Amino acid sequence: LNRALEKAMRLAKHDVLVVIISDFFGVDEQTSKLAARISAHNDMLGILVHDPMRVDPPAGRLRVSDGQNQLDMDLDERRLRERLVTDYREEQERITHFLRRLSAPLLMISNEGDVVKQVRRLLGVAPVSNMDEMLSLSDMQD
């Protein structure tokens, strides 16, 4: 995320909408500094990509990964599932606080669905079913 923000800082000089689509894993002090510098002269929007299984983890065995390492977890124990949900809620609060300090709204999308469709829905953009319909919409704008 920090590398992406460094690049955004070079590109977004003034009055630009910077959209961060991320799981926000690994937000640190450097992330906060970079984002604050960007948001000083630009608008920001955060789109959190989340895993619905973290909201309500199922009982049973589950393989989890941080992108590099994998771990098999036995989620039959209710206390472990509750702890995972608590950790997820605390993580959500940190992300919300991070974006609130930047005056950046937060939207959420799931890693289970089509990202483009979810973003269009969140932004209130109706899906276009075919090319003819899209062309007729563009004619209306002229």
PLM regions and their residue ranges:
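Acidic beta-strand-to-loop metal/phosphate-binding motif
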Residues: 17-23
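Von Willebrand factor type A / integrin I
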Residues: 10-14, 28-142
